[in-house]
């Protein structure tokens, strides 16, 4: 078994030098910067306006529901892209499986709509 020691040594040396250089640059950046506490820098950014209220307030659950809905439909799209690519090569079972998948997602969306998750 032939080992390629020289090639791996060059790669290993490159990784070590890159890591050391990144650490040195980060350390120099930390040590050489001025650290001034400014209320403008530590406040929450609200589209260019001064913050109206404390940023540590409660967050409405409706936003979480919208985020979960977005995640579900994003996941659905991630399943539909590969299916659309191999559509001509799949069998009848694959076609029925994706139609069943879309049907279950549609039923879930209708259920969320009827429960009022999308009403603000």
From Swiss-Prot:
Q: What is its main location?
A: mitochondrion
Q: Which InterPro entries match?
A: NADH_UbQ/plastoQ_OxRdtase_su3, NDAH_ubi_oxred_su3_sf
Per its UniProt entry, which superkingdom is the organism in? Answer: Eukaryota
* Membrane found in the keyword field: yes
The catalytic activity, as recorded, is: a ubiquinone + NADH + 5 H(+)(in) = a ubiquinol + NAD(+) + 4 H(+)(out)
Q: Which UniProt keywords apply?
A: Electron transport, Membrane, Mitochondrion, NAD, Respiratory chain, Translocase, Transmembrane, Transmembrane helix, Transport, Ubiquinone
List where the protein spans the membrane.
Answer: 8-28, 63-83, 90-110
Tell me how this protein sits in the membrane: Multi-pass membrane protein
Q: What is its EC number?
A: 7.1.1.2
Gene3D superfamilies xref list:
NADH:ubiquinone/plastoquinone oxidoreductase, chain 3 (1.20.58.1610)
Q: Which GO terms describe its cellular component?
A: mitochondrial membrane; NADH dehydrogenase complex
The compartments listed are:
Mitochondrion membrane
Q: What Pfam families does its record include? A: Oxidored_q4
Q: Which family does it belong to?
A: Belongs to the complex I subunit 3 family.
Which purpose does this protein serve, as stated in its record? Core subunit of the mitochondrial membrane respiratory chain NADH dehydrogenase (Complex I) that is believed to belong to the minimal assembly required for catalysis. Complex I functions in the transfer of electrons from NADH to the respiratory chain. The immediate electron acceptor for the enzyme is believed to be ubiquinone.
**Name recorded for this polypeptide:** NADH-ubiquinone oxidoreductase chain 3
Question: Which gene name does the record give?
Answer: ND3
